[in-house]
Amino acid sequence: MVVYSSTEKKRIRKDFGKRPKVLDIPYLLSIQLNSFQKFIKHDPNGIHGLESAFRSIFPIRSYNGNSELQYINYKLGQPIFNVKECQTRGMTYSSPLRVKLRLVIYEKETLDITVKDIKEQEVYMGEIPLMTTNGTFIINGTERVVVSQLHRSPGVFFDSDKGKTHSSGKVLYNARIIPYRGSWLDFEFDPKDNLFFRIDRRRKLPISIILKALNYNTEQILDTFFKKNIFKFTENSILMKLVPHRLRGETASFDICIDNKTYIKKGQRITARHINILKEKKIHTIKVPTEYLIGKISAKNYFNKKTNEIIVSANTELNINIIKELKNNEYTNIETIFTNDLDHGPYISETLNIDPTHDKLSALVEIYRMMRPGEPPTREAAENLFENLFFSEERYDLSSVGRMKFNRSLQKQNITERGVLNQSDIISVIKKLIDIRNGHGEIDDIDHLGNRRVRSVGEMAENQFRIGLIRVERAVKDRLSLGDLDMLMPQDMINAKPISAAIKEFFGSSQLSQFMDQNNPLSEITHKRRISALGLGGLTRERAGFEVRDVHPTHYGRVCPIETPEGPNIGLINSLSVYAQTNSYGFLETPYRKIHNGKVTNEIKYLSAIEEGNFIIAQANTNLDETGAFVEDLITCRYKGESSLFNKNQINYMDVSTQQIVSVGASLIPFLEHDDANRALMGANMQRQAVPTLRSEKPLVGTGMERAVAVDSGVTIIAKRGGIVQYVDASRIIIKVKKNEINSEEAGIDIYNLKKYTRSNQNTCINQIPCISLGENVEKGNVLADGPSTDLGELALGQNMRVAFMPWNGYNFEDSILISEKVVQEDRFTTIHIQELACISRDTKLGSEEITSDIPNVGEAALSKLDESGIVYIGAEVNGGDILVGKVTPKGETQLTPEEKLLRAIFGEKASDVKDSSLRVPNGVLGTVIDVQIFTRDGVKKDKRALEIEEMQLKQAKKDLTEEQKVFELGLFTQIKSTLINSGMNIDQLNKIPKSELFKVKVTNNLYQKKIHKLFLKYEELKKCFNKKLETTRNKITQGDDLAPGVLKIVKVYLAVKRHIQPGDKMAGRHGNKGVISKINPIEDMPYDQNGLPVDVVLNPLGVPSRMNIGQILETHLGLASKGLGNIIDTMLKQQKSILNIRKFIQKAFNLGNNTRQKTNLNNFSDDEILSLAKNFKNGIPISTPVFDGAQESEIKALLKLADLPSSGQITLFDGRTGEKFERPVTVGYMYMLKLNHLVDDKMHARSTGSYSLVTQQPLGGKAQFGGQRFGEMEVWALEAYGAAYTLQEMLTVKSDDVNGRTKMYKNIVDGNYKMEPGMPESFNVLLKEIRSLAINIELENE
């Protein structure tokens, strides 16, 4: 049986899922929170976070070694302001970082080093931004999210150019060693098969140079990379030591005879058969002619034994003279390198031939010249440079991930070694690269998720912090070397600015620190779970090819194949799948059920993409019997990225859930399995743009993910502990905690404050509404209050609309949507938008700006909504152009004419020294002022309104704290009373004692006396805490604000704008079916059914077939059934049918269909619970149809039948205007529709007289500039085609850039003279000037 929480009991979703729920959906924000926790948490091993950064930089030694600064530990202080205060004040929510440092000064006496002095001190090292409980940061008052980055994992990668580089189409292989920190090292073949290396993508050098720099000589190089052929000189012949398989594929250049028998004739190709014969005969040497030796390459240096002169150096081709000389010098054995064209190419040998260097020093010098061109190389400089490139821990680090990937790639057993490279590493990489070129081994797939890892917030912040510390390190080193250390303390060494600057830069302007998308809870959660391939150290849009963006088999269960933006970022920005998480190395992993002896168990194992490749994995929708064994013998499984059929005994793992492969956004689309992928992508993206409506309504057809999203997003209020609701109003909920959940020394009261009408990042409204009632019992984890777009703890992005699929007079042409006036009247899609408008008063050169109600040249009417301080009242309804905050700016002294001087002298008018620069309501905005905030600089006198606001805030704070204290005191007194009663005291006696005296009562039982004493201490502590809180709050409210330089005062006005739905607004369903409202039709004109019920929305049926999103039709049918069942329950309630009948009917609906997952026995519910359930079911029984495991067609039909509706889902409709029946039944049902944040009010505007461009004098474009409509060249052609010469002339002159003409025309209109006189357009003058700038003079002749 399914166990429901008390919130779920209020409204159960009928679940059509067939597969059992093996694994609960993990906390959806864990990727953000865990990563940041790792960063700030103290790590004793020093592998992660701040500790790792400090340990990697400290101790800092002076250049002469006389002193060093050591790191001991760090601690993060408490943030001064809480999240809400930081948002209103425009501050960063952060805590101070204090680090304990030790300065040690040494005394160098002869050889011994003794400690002269030790000083310890705690040093302030800047502020570290903190993450809020919802995984965001408050930076300068705005909520931001740091998106995780998918970047190429450190390690070694073998790749090829796929034959694209060289014209011949030859495939060139390369290897690249990528460290976490340090220089990249590349090895590559050129078209002539020589091997080269590059450092940091600079000029390439032959690979032998790096080998010589590693102290290898030519002999050692050949010895390392080649096998040897050994030839023995006898008196009259040459014998070759035979290794039979090396002859394969060669053409014999001589007869191969053994015991006078010829086995292989000259010119014959040596095959495997010949080699087997040679092996069988156990022949170890064969006789070869001298010619066979000519052209072979010597593997060693051979010297003249008498003169010690070199006869032949290693890597030299042998010729007849060299062979003779070797014989003369009595060499019996000669070694040559073994190469062939098949699988042992002579690459290194040929590369040595083009290498200009001859020893280690010349190789180092060559590397130095390549890295630092133009600088004269010295031996020491060259050695240091090479040493620091790859072998110094300060400059180079593969990291534990890089080392693991590196050693795995080279098949080394040990995966933990140092982070720097060594000789054997470089040799191993070159060997593997040569093997790949020789046809052994495969290249890596760089888009495989085993080669790409996720870098989350914590790691990026740590890297940034380390950069700041490195800057500090340089300064400290210089400071330590200056002497006079006796007077200095660690504090004097450290300047926190570079660290703060690095952190600030990252959180403020990094490409991955983004302004949070806060349209609705889903967009918040998706933004935090986003994974981007862009950003520092990642890809750029321009360079990213098709392969990187494409869906890869390893994305399965890790990255969503559906949710990604349309446009230039497609495939580069992805979303994490529902169950995916990162492992300790940063690779994405996904859970699977383990299979033991052919039976699927509930044991869960997380596998990364690398591990997954070795297993055969069955899909989640595979049929199992009761014991967990597979029903079929052959099952579709995935193995190494391919799907095929496998025997059931071969399978190792099985998927956990059908929604494992998709992201949170896509898992909210019901019947996703019936939608085309492109439309599903649009659907997932558009859900994030839905604006929270005035009253949220749960979807009738959901997927069961709605609750998880709403709860995890943090917009709802969740009970921390169970208990009874003691008090509830619109802004506060108080819960008396259950006894078994109370700690012994506390009052047992939980207070929850609700957010009321605050503004989101996207200007939508955030408002929390309690969804529990007084005296209700709540459990831990229950939803206490709904936030924006949530309904009883479920995500509710839109509204359930009664839709009909039919054409209606062309009003739904091209995806347009026809809606009924009823939708507007019922405020179904009315949304509240909150705009923040700020007025800043600055100190200017001419004097300071002033906020006042005394504004020059403004009538009384315009000032009617302002108070005496010049600031608008709260509650005032304002229109476009109204003054919100009166402000005057000093004007520069202008030269006055004598007449003006005279007037000034007579009337004494001085007010014209200032100009009006008031804050006005933007054009086209109509709203109500809901809040005003005033921030005044320290030392500037506060105006009357500011003092009023301050007083009000203090009153409110005091009231809140007093109420809070009262509640806690009540809790304590209740505990004391129960203790005294338990000790044997009479209740009547107790009631006579005043509360304040209760603590003084003495009881005989020592245990109870101790408990009372403890409670008394708690009471005293509570009082102290209350006074302290009050004092802190008072200080925060009364102190001046920290404003930017030159700013005296900031007034912020918040306007609430109510937007009804209107033609031009964009709406969409959840299946990528979007459209614009074309007309709002009167209710009486809408099509209606035989009961007279009109439809709300008419959609075009032609929008379905070509788009292939059939999910919307199935949703409509299921929605109809759901609503039909709701209507039946509603009728039963109205007819006051017995609760038994209602229980039976709801049970019947729940039992319908093959829903093994949801077995609900309503007999366990009380009558009250059934009644509450039925009331919530009046508008339809909510249904959940999980993705890839949803309702079948037969189940939908059965549900329609139960609701007494036609099983086709089609109904006869009548035309609202004529009353005539439409000629065929129409698909009618309920679809969940969203209103998207693309409102016509934000897009449409009309220009009167506005601003003009400076050079061309043409009107500007765009709403922000109050611009006009562009009349482009195509429009000009159109008028030319019609021969409308005068209209064209008007467009190109007076309506555009004929300055005199347009002024004249304005005057003429005022005078009532409707004539126009076109003049010379300004753009023509610009053209003249441009031609003159080419030294061609053009003069205009006057007629």
Swiss-Prot record:
The keyword Transferase applies. GO terms for cellular component: DNA-directed RNA polymerase complex. The keyword Transferase applies. GO terms for molecular function: DNA binding; DNA-directed RNA polymerase activity; ribonucleoside binding. Keywords: DNA-directed RNA polymerase, Nucleotidyltransferase, Transcription, Transferase. GO terms for biological process: DNA-templated transcription. Pfam families: RNA_pol_Rpb2_1, RNA_pol_Rpb2_2, RNA_pol_Rpb2_3, RNA_pol_Rpb2_45, RNA_pol_Rpb2_6, RNA_pol_Rpb2_7. Its EC number is 2.7.7.6. It is an enzyme of class 2 (transferase). It catalyses: RNA(n) + a ribonucleoside 5'-triphosphate = RNA(n+1) + diphosphate. Gene3D superfamilies: 2.40.50.100, 2.40.50.150, 3.90.1100.10, DNA-directed RNA polymerase, beta subunit, external 1 domain (2.30.150.10), DNA-directed RNA polymerase, subunit 2, domain 6 (2.40.270.10), RNA polymerase alpha subunit dimerisation domain (3.90.1800.10), RNA polymerase Rpb2, domain 2 (3.90.1110.10). Belongs to the RNA polymerase beta chain family. DNA-dependent RNA polymerase catalyzes the transcription of DNA into RNA using the four ribonucleoside triphosphates as substrates. The RNAP catalytic core consists of 2 alpha, 1 beta, 1 beta' and 1 omega subunit. When a sigma factor is associated with the core the holoenzyme is formed, which can initiate transcription. This is DNA-directed RNA polymerase subunit beta.
